């Protein structure tokens, strides 16, 4: 177990920790190569409910075990994020979708075949195993398969999906430069993975697939017209 230093607030019955003065492990990686020793080190931190800042195909993300209420609460506290706002997750492959979502519509197969791996987050009905604190106490979950070799390898090695919230304080700009990520989060998280400057640009596009007709909740890297042709 980790020892927490900082202020504690109540988050719908869960303890949220604002970290201070932790020892942060910096791990520098080649995002195109999955070196087992590097990935294994970070995966072990996640399995122990650690918080990891990691590179993606868009910006840097803040990752914890999506099944651990205490780890999820740490992520909310670090971002100073409204606990009523849910966190999405990243998966390692298409098969992992069933560990986080149920009642998946048939249109899902067309969208994931066209746009995954890539910057598309699909909102689905959440698996009952997912803690309420991750979902903002709703019943849906955002899921993404990233176009990032190292990140997919990390999630596969960890053995569970991890949170995909951007590594920034609530209301602040997303981070694509690892130097900035270290400035913001060193001493506050257990590990920062330096995978170089990420692609940046736009965040992922978010599509709600929980209703009869899908709807775009946020237009991002994938333009709406490329998606709407699948259901209009």
What is each PLM-predicted segment?
Residues 17-232:
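Active-site-adjacent structural elements in enzyme catalytic cores
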